[in-house]
Amino acid sequence: MVNSCCGSVCSDQGCGLENCCRPSCCQTTCCRTTCCRPSCCVSSCCRPQCCQSVCCQPTCCRPSCCQTTCCRTTCCRPSCCVSSCCRPQCCQSVCCQPTCCRPSCCQTTCCRTTCCRPSCCVSSCCRPQCCQSVCCQPTCCRPSCCISSSCCPSCCESSCCRPCCCLRPVCGRVSCHTTCYRPTCVISTCPRPLCCASSCC
């Protein structure tokens, strides 16, 4: 039984046996729970019932195998972009999904509108599409983030002083902050600006 099953030709009747789990038997008909061994991790055996930690190999990176135990660098594929796989080593551009918005995944390639979360507010993610009120942190004060909808007043740092941050109609009220002025914004009701050009102070 063993020789006839675990040789070059595997029969469907005996391939599920415990003593038959050999690399030569890892064919589609052999993908059973009793055959989930490291030596059986081939693409034809990547079934949900075989997705164990021992089967996390590059050839086994299938959507059905994207489980927490399979989140390894060799399994970072677009089909494996699930929330349980959001590890630093899996943060590739193909994995930038809303479910992958973790601090460890906040890299330049992941700076998309779906990833604009407070936990993702890092300097490398300071893009215009991420300049939301939740992302107005000192590390996010970049020229590209100085837009009127999100930069006044919570994001008006010295590095963010742009004319779009100093709206004239509200310069004397809400957004009158000393770190957010430009010559176009200086009016008599505002204090001496710290971010103004010397010619305007």
UniProtKB/Swiss-Prot annotation:
Region (31 X 5 AA repeats of C-C-[GRQVIL]-[SPTR]-[VSTQPC]): 5-169
Domain of life, per lineage: Eukaryota
Record key words, sorted: Keratin, Repeat
GO cellular component: cytosol; keratin filament
InterPro entries: KAP (IPR002494)
Tissues in which the protein is found: Expressed in the hair follicles.
Placement of Sequence repeats on the sequence: 5-9, 20-24, 25-29, 30-34, 35-39, 40-44, 45-49, 50-54, 55-59, 60-64, 65-69, 70-74, 75-79, 80-84, 85-89, 90-94, 95-99, 100-104, 105-109, 110-114, 115-119, 120-124, 125-129, 130-134, 135-139, 140-144, 145-149, 155-159, 160-164, 165-169
Entry keyword Repeat: yes
Function recorded in the entry: In the hair cortex, hair keratin intermediate filaments are embedded in an interfilamentous matrix, consisting of hair keratin-associated proteins (KRTAP), which are essential for the formation of a rigid and resistant hair shaft through their extensive disulfide bond cross-linking with abundant cysteine residues of hair keratins. The matrix proteins include the high-sulfur and high-glycine-tyrosine keratins.
Subunit and interaction comment: Interacts with hair keratins.
Family per record: Belongs to the KRTAP type 4 family.
Protein name, UniProt field: Keratin-associated protein 4-12
Organism lineage: Eukaryota, Metazoa, Chordata, Craniata, Vertebrata
